[in-house]
Amino acid sequence: MRPGTGAERGGLMVSEMESHPPSQGPGDGERRLSGSSLCSGSWVSADGFLRRRPSMGHPGMHYAPMGMHPMGQRANMPPVPHGMMPQMMPPMGGPPMGQMPGMMSSVMPGMMMSHMSQASMQPALPPGVNSMDVAAGTASGAKSMWTEHKSPDGRTYYYNTETKQSTWEKPDDLKTPAEQLLSKCPWKEYKSDSGKPYYYNSQTKESRWAKPKELEDLEGYQNTIVAGSLITKSNLHAMIKAEESSKQEECTTTSTAPVPTTEIPTTMSTMAAAEAAAAVVAAAAAAAAAAAAANANASTSASNTVSGTVPVVPEPEVTSIVATVVDNENTVTISTEEQAQLTSTPAIQDQSVEVSSNTGEETSKQETVADFTPKKEEEESQPAKKTYTWNTKEEAKQAFKELLKEKRVPSNASWEQAMKMIINDPRYSALAKLSEKKQAFNAYKVQTEKEEKEEARSKYKEAKESFQRFLENHEKMTSTTRYKKAEQMFGEMEVWNAISERDRLEIYEDVLFFLSKKEKEQAKQLRKRNWEALKNILDNMANVTYSTTWSEAQQYLMDNPTFAEDEELQNMDKEDALICFEEHIRALEKEEEEEKQKSLLRERRRQRKNRESFQIFLDELHEHGQLHSMSSWMELYPTISSDIRFTNMLGQPGSTALDLFKFYVEDLKARYHDEKKIIKDILKDKGFVVEVNTTFEDFVAIISSTKRSTTLDAGNIKLAFNSLLEKAEAREREREKEEARKMKRKESAFKSMLKQAAPPIELDAVWEDIRERFVKEPAFEDITLESERKRIFKDFMHVLEHECQHHHSKNKKHSKKSKKHHRKRSRSRSGSDSDDDDSHSKKKRQRSESRSASEHSSSAESERSYKKSKKHKKKSKKRRHKSDSPESDAEREKDKKEKDRESEKDRTRQRSESKHKSPKKKTGKDSGNWDTSGSELSEGELEKRRRTLLEQLDDDQ
């Protein structure tokens, strides 16, 4: 190849892009060169190099894009972005990531497809220097997915036809090379609320009012790039000729593995920038020489090509304004599988790499380098190979993330920008698929952005804390200092300007609140100190007592030297001093009251001790048997009164000696039931039973024979004996009663035997005559004594004789009484019919099987009225017997009226009840005789009952 091939290639791409705009077909990353000067199989790829399609047909033949779908029609008006970035704050993230087409293997053998847009991989370049990548990105044949639009208010926004998203920021695909250089600068320009521009560094999170030098230099480079021309037409023809001369060697090449080459940056010069162009040409010659040396090394190391490892020399990266640094210290280990992919789809890197195994091509490249031979050539030794192994995909992903972290890839970097920083590292190939790399890169960006935000937040928080501490600790700051005054004092300080106005106001208010609280706390401490000092002075003054007044205390304080020397104490609030004195006096009063209480407690304790001593004295009397539950005060008074403990009890309030004695005896009596159980247990164990004839001495001897009797009270033992003796007597009486009942039952059985004798016993019978008839009867055998049998027989005969006499007399009495009652009934009945009619009506009622409900009610009412009239008669008779005075006549008259009223009420009640109870009224004789028949029926029933009662009385007699 001839010198200037790289420049010619770049010029070919740019000029062809200008003369032939990209078609509306699918953007496959490559563009066919349509010109008479181009050879028939030539092809310009997205990386800016002239390539040949293998197995290329006739130049006029066009191949349809493989595996690509046509782009859909774009909407007329895409949506406007939802919001705007705040002017005071820099953008939180980087520009939108450029869309990178996926890596596709070509369908036709040998067809080469570009992996991604070259426009998104622009390196940072010095002023006046442009690379093949910049030119290739500008001349990309693929149609951009971003379109430019205007919002209703005239602002420009950009719409992505593929993702359907819109943004205010210009995407990388639409940026010029100069704009891309500016976008990579960490310094961005923003405007404050007042419209004043300021500059913010997205990496260091620093903001300043003055324009940074880096940004000024890049803006100067942009003006130079716009003014210069990219390449001339002669360079384009030279590159085409170089491609034609190497066409034969490329067609015969079977290996498509890339050989390390160096992309030669070209200079864009204007008529005013001739010196800059000369410098760029010299730099291009040096880079070409380095590429030739690398090609020579690659041709001699055939074993590397066979084993699948090819050393790659990266493109020089510009890191300063005046020089470029070539980083060729890293090697990339490529597997055999990746080599196979590279044959069909070459990987797009920040440096354009091309490998040729043809010896002739190497010779032509060496000749090209010979034309640009520098003054001094240095032999670079082959870099040491370093291989990495990853057992799992997680380890590979982690290694890829560590690579990003090690290279310090910022969170707002795009994928193209990140590739420039990491592609030369062997760990870049840890993940085989591009999607996996992008996924890991996105995860790294999210994590890094989170860490950067957290770091920025912590720094800002630290700045706020420093500002707050500064205000809180400054001696000129008080709770009454105004913000404007503080701004005049501290406005020029860095700590004042480190935070925003809004946060500064909030912190200032918090500081004022803190200072106010602090001042109050100090005043409180001073008040507490004065309080304690005054309290100590009052405590040490012996002449101040609980009865001292405030005026007296003030005079004492003025005479006190400690109070006179303390100025703060003299400036103490008078109200606080008075309150302190009042509390001191209350404390003295409390001490005086406590002393009185203590003396009272001592006196009460002495009285309690006297009572306890007397209680012990009573215990001693009980142990000696002199005091028990049946003791009395009068019996023991001579013994008790002679003891000193009784004398100490005299005259003291509370319980007296007599009260304690009674309580003691009551306690002994309360123990009776428990001790009685113990006594019963002792008797049960001994098998002793208290009988009627048991003496107390025998009982005591049995009880005292066991150890359990030592705690028993003598009085309770006596009471228990009396109780057991009473129970014994009760048992004896019950036994006698039971024997009497048994004897009575036997007598009854014997009498029953005599009464049921067949034939019956005559009244003149003798016991000896009839005895043999009952000898074998059980009732006869139950009574063992013959005298008892004779006695029972005599009693039986006497009863039999009495019953016989009573039976004869009863018949006579019955006839007389019946006549008497018959006469009385005929006289007392008024307004009724004759006795024959009465008996006839009674027989009629008796024969009737059913009576109506009205007849029952009328008979019941008539019976009730009869009883009332009889009752009134008895009352009137009593009154008549009690008194015969004129007052008795008046009472009789009253009774008569009351009787008439009651009889009238009874009649009306009977009529109303008969009306309500009878379902139908009867006509004729029945309805007229209703009440009369009812009254007659009731009188007949009453007479019948009277007769029955009289007969029962006669039978009883």
From Swiss-Prot:
GO CC terms: membrane; nuclear matrix; nuclear speck; nucleoplasm; U1 snRNP; U2-type prespliceosome
Phosphoserine: residues carrying this PTM: S34, S151, S723, S787, S883, S885, S888, S933, S935, S938
Omega-N-methylarginine PTM sites in chain numbering: R9
Stored Gene3D superfamilies: 2.20.70.10, FF domain
Keyword Repeat: yes
Record-listed cross-link Glycyl lysine isopeptide (Lys-Gly) (interchain with G-Cter in SUMO2), residues: K191, K241, K375, K376
FF domain mapped to chain residues: 393-447, 460-514, 527-587, 607-667, 672-727, 742-799
PROSITE patterns the UniProt entry points to: FF, WW_DOMAIN_1, WW_DOMAIN_2
Keyword set, alphabetical order: Acetylation, Cell cycle, Cell division, Isopeptide bond, Methylation, mRNA processing, mRNA splicing, Nucleus, Phosphoprotein, Repeat, Ubl conjugation
Record region (Disordered): 1-36, 243-263, 337-386, 803-957
One Pfam short name: FF_PRPF40A
PTM-bearing positions, type N6-acetyllysine: K196
Organs and tissues of expression: Expressed in the brain cortex (at protein level). Widely expressed.
Residue spans of biased composition, Basic and acidic residues class: 883-916
Residues covered by the WW domain: 140-173, 181-214
PTM-bearing positions, type Phosphothreonine: T345, T373, T932
Gene Ontology MF term list: RNA binding
Main location as per UniProt: nucleus
Gene Ontology biological-process annotations: cell division; cell migration; cytoskeleton organization; mRNA cis splicing, via spliceosome; mRNA splicing, via spliceosome; regulation of cell shape; regulation of cytokinesis
Compositionally biased intervals (Low complexity): 252-262
Ranges of biased composition (kind: Basic residues): 807-828, 867-882
Function statement: Binds to WASL/N-WASP and suppresses its translocation from the nucleus to the cytoplasm, thereby inhibiting its cytoplasmic function. Plays a role in the regulation of cell morphology and cytoskeletal organization. Required in the control of cell shape and migration. May play a role in cytokinesis. May be involved in pre-mRNA splicing.
Record note on quaternary structure: Interacts with the N-terminus of HTT. Interacts with the phosphorylated C-terminal domain of POLR2A. Interacts with AKAP8L, SF1, SRPK1, ENAH, ATBF1 and MECP2. Interacts through the WW domains with formin proline-rich regions and with WASL/N-WASP.
Protein family membership: Belongs to the PRPF40 family.
Domain notes: The WW domains are essential for localization to nuclear speckles.
Protein name: Pre-mRNA-processing factor 40 homolog A
Organism for this UniProt entry: Homo sapiens (Human)
